[in-house]
Each structure stands twice: as C-alpha cells, then as structure tokens.
C-alpha cells in the first residue's frame, strides 16, 4: 500500500471583481466604478494599492486612509473649504468663502496592473506590486481602461455571504457522504 503525502494549500488567489456600492453621504468616500487602485504612501516609503476609498482629512488637510496613510498624489483640502466635489475623472475641487467658482486642488490618479491577481496582500486592505503583477500604469480615472471615481460611495465586499454559506454546506454534505463510504468499506 502507498502512503499519501497529505494535502496543503498551494495558493490563495485574490479575486478583484467589483463589489456593490453603498452610499455614505461622506464627501470624502470614493468608490472606483471599474478597474483601478488608489495609491497610498505607506510608512516605510513604499506605495501600497487599495480599492478601499474611505478617506478622511488629517490635521494638515491631506486626504488619508482611516489608518492615516496619505493618498498619492497628495491632495490637500484648505481648512476654510465650504464644499468638496470629486468628479468621475478624479478632479477634486473645493468651494471657498467669497469665491464665485470652485477651485481645483488636485486630481486622484488610479493604478492598473497587467495581472491584478499577482498583487501581494500586506494587510489593512493594502496590496503591493510584485513581479507577477507587473509594474503599475498610473493615470486619471476614465482614461485608457481605468474606472471612474464616484464620490459619496464606498465599495462593499465582492463576496456573497449567502452563496459562500451554501457552498460550505454542500462541501460538508459531500464530506459526510465520503466519510460514510470509507467507513462502510472498512467494515
């Protein structure tokens, strides 16, 4: 008889299919409709990539993640801004007291990769580029194959809990049937 070598997970693959959106009423929340990742300046000086667009302002007025990491390229909102507007092409403008028209303070740029599945998770919804992902192509939203930015929304998980629970129950039933088959064969 030959002894088995057991099983192990060879890899866990991330699936970057877009999730549903939920409206937040927060003008600093930004969802990406289509392909692309926000660029985030990490504390070690490297750039991380994320689709999590729940941003806030730090004490200097810069757009940052919930963990305080700066969005790249950096965008600073003036402290006296009355209104913040982000269009589908990533242009960020503010209305200031006494101004007759909004002022553009920056443009959000998105990164795309030849092979998104090659990105390596680093935690906190951040990923880093690898040889497998290729180098990022950076550009404005709605240019080339990049998605559009949507202000006041965040992207939800792309996993359907109900569907995954059904899959788990099916796997459990298959295991039980196979277990009974082996038990019957042993008797």
Regions found by a protein language model. Name each.
Residues 1-187:
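Amphipathic alpha-helical polymerization modules
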């Amino acid at each position: 008889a030959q002894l088995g070598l057991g099983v192990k997970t060879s890899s866990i693959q991330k699936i970057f299919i877009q999730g549903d959106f939920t409206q937040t009423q927060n003008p600093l929340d930004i969802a990406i409709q289509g392909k692309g990742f926000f660029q985030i300046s990490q504390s070690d000086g490297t750039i991380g990539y994320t689709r999590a667009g729940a941003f806030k302002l730090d004490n200097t007025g810069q757009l940052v993640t919930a963990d305080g990491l700066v969005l790249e390229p950096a965008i600073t909102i003036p402290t006296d801004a009355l209104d913040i507007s982000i269009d589908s092409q990533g242009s960020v403008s503010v209305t200031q007291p006494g101004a007759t028209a909004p002022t553009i303070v920056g443009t959000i740029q998105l990164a795309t990769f030849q092979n998104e599945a090659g990105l390596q998770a680093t935690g906190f919804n951040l990923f880093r580029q690898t040889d497998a992902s290729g180098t990022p192509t950076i550009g404005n939203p709605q240019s080339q194959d990049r998605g559009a930015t949507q202000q006041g929304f965040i992207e939800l998980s792309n996993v359907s809990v109900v569907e995954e629970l059904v899959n788990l129950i099916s796997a459990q039933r298959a295991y039980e049937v196979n277990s009974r088959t082996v038990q019957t064969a042993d008797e």
